[in-house]
Structure formats: C-alpha cells, structure tokens
Amino acid sequence: PPPGSGIPPAAYADYIGKTSAIAPGYRYDSRNDPFDPSRGRRFNFSTTIAGGPLGGNFSYVKPVGAATSYFRTGRKSHFAVNMEGGFIRAYDGKEIPIFERFRIGGDRSVRGFQYGSIYPLDGDDKAFFTEQGALLGGDKYLVFNAELVRAIAGPLKLVLFFDAGNAWLEGQSFNPFKLRASTGAELRMFLPIFQAPLRFIYGINLAPKTIKGPDGSPLNGGAEKSSDFQFSIG
C-alpha cells in the first residue's frame, strides 16, 4: 500500500545492510572569521553517490547544497541570510534508506521546532509511514534562515531570527507558501575554549499544527508546541 494508508505508527524500523558511497564536493569560503563571521560568503555543495558499481545494499544519489552571506549593518551589528536544500533519488530498483531521508527542525535548521519534527504531510496534516510503521522523511527539502546579530557586551551577542523550511515526498509539489516558519531571539556567546559559540535559543512556531497518524488520531499527544527553548554549542 502507499505510505500512510492503514499503517499503524511506530517509532523506529530496523534496517540491516551496507552502504558503499562516495561524496565529492566543492566549498568556497570568504568569511572574515570561521567561528564568528560578520562579513563574507560561504558556499558548499556535495553529492553522495551510493551503490551501483560501488556495491552495497542501497543505491541512491543525494545532492545537497547551502549558501550563506554576511553583511555589516553597523559597527556592532551584521545581517546574515542562508539558504540550503537537497534531494535524494534511488536507482537500480532500490528504495531510499529511511535514515537518509530529510527531516528538519532544531537549532541547525528551523529554530523553534524540535529536532527532526518537520517532515512531509498530506493536505490533511497526516504524516506518512512505511509499511513497517516508521515515520517517513522527505525526498527533498528546503531551509531559509535570516538573522540580525548585535553585539551587546564582550563576547555576548543578541540574535533576532526568522527561519522557514519544509520537506516533501517525490510526488508532492514545492509550495513556498506552505513552509513551516518560526521567529525568535537567541543569545550567542563565543568562548575561545570551545572554538564555537554557546547558543541559548527561544523560538516561536508561527503556525502550530496538529499532526495526525494514518488513522487520523493526533501524533505526539496533540498539537505542536507553540514555542521551544534550545541550547546548542556551535
């Protein structure tokens, strides 16, 4: 049956197999500081090619790219914008490994959402599942981030942000007006001992949904949280 039709939900599915892959890529970086940038650009693109002549149990192609730009807006402030996306396609009659599918959300993608909580939904906000009952991630995804960063005192900075993104299955069309979105604030402190910033993030889900399972009952106990606090390093 197609994903999501009469399949009882389950948290995990077991996969046993070997992936043999190569991942050539390209990276460009002109940022003024690799850990705490305020101007410059960064671009990276890579394609993972698995299976086929490389062997293994899974055969797929997975290109992913991201571009980020930083602009000075004042002596103590800057603006940053980031866009990233990717897709995955299987070949040789193989299926896409469930652990290679895209699920976004969290401090590295769409803040204000719990990690991995954004995934494909149908028109009635039902999630999709495999025949084994595992939640399906997307065949493709897109993430957009914009933030204004202002130095407060010493290593402490205030960040105001807007994030948006979503993941879709292959048969679903991309709709820029149906991205999951959040806004909020972040305190960011760079400490040399970590070589990365400490991040205290408060994000607001701009349109909480009640995501449903195959039988129409709410997943995860009901509606999504309207806000979320996150801590991260890096």
Model-derived regions, located:
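Short Gly/Pro-enriched loop/turn and capping motifs at secondary-structure junctions
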Residues: 165-167, 192-194, 205-209
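Conserved short loop/turn motifs at secondary-structure junctions
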Residues: 50-51, 204-206
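Conserved active-site loop/cleft motifs that coordinate metal ions or position small ligands
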Residues: 158-161, 196-203
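Strand-loop-strand
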Residues: 170, 175-185, 189-195
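C-terminal outer-membrane beta-barrel translocator/porin domains of Gram-negative envelope proteins
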Residues: 1-152, 160-164, 168-177, 211-224, ...
